[in-house]
Amino acid sequence: MSKKIKYVVLFVEGETEKEFYESLIRFYRLKSKNAITQSKVFNVKGISRFEKTVTSKLKIEVLPKFHNSEIEVVCCYDTDVFELAQKPPINWKIVRKKVNDLGINSFHEIKAVKMIEDWFLKDIVGLSQYLKIDVPKKLEGKSGYEKIKTLFKKGKKPKVYQKGSNTHKFIPDLNIQLIRDAVKDELAPLEKALSVKL
């Protein structure tokens, strides 16, 4: 019996994350010593929509096309909404079970500690170059999101940072290698699923 072809499906919180993960996968394709696994990124459009969207996308868009493939599911999200919430917006055990019920046994979570903006700040030089400002000595704001919003206000072009809006314009200016190296432990399950060898 021939070995099944692998297919990795990423589910992300929003447009900002979709832009970033698509850039990260392009980086892996360029830098990996071997061919990486075929993949697709879906935007679930909000943390609370993972449970419903993951199963419906798998049923309608993935399984009919890749029913003979070994499918791996990767859910990528920010941890900030789980840290202080008395009732978290999503129960990952339920999501995992629903994925398993579809006959998919490989399920991974990629957690951006606090939020993905904290990852972007790992390349403060690239962000500053995009905004045409000097690299700040100190960042203002409590969260990564607030810090990036403050940076954008100082910038020469778009003066407003809004999750999902204009992200495609600054993501190419980011040093993906630098960010990947800084958060490689968090990205390890994704790299394994994609068969990345750097």
Role assignments for model-derived ranges:
Residues 11-14, 18:
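Extended, compositionally biased accessory segments flanking or bridging domains
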Residues 1-6, 18-45, 55-198:
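C-terminal accessory helical subdomains adjacent to catalytic cores in phosphodiester-
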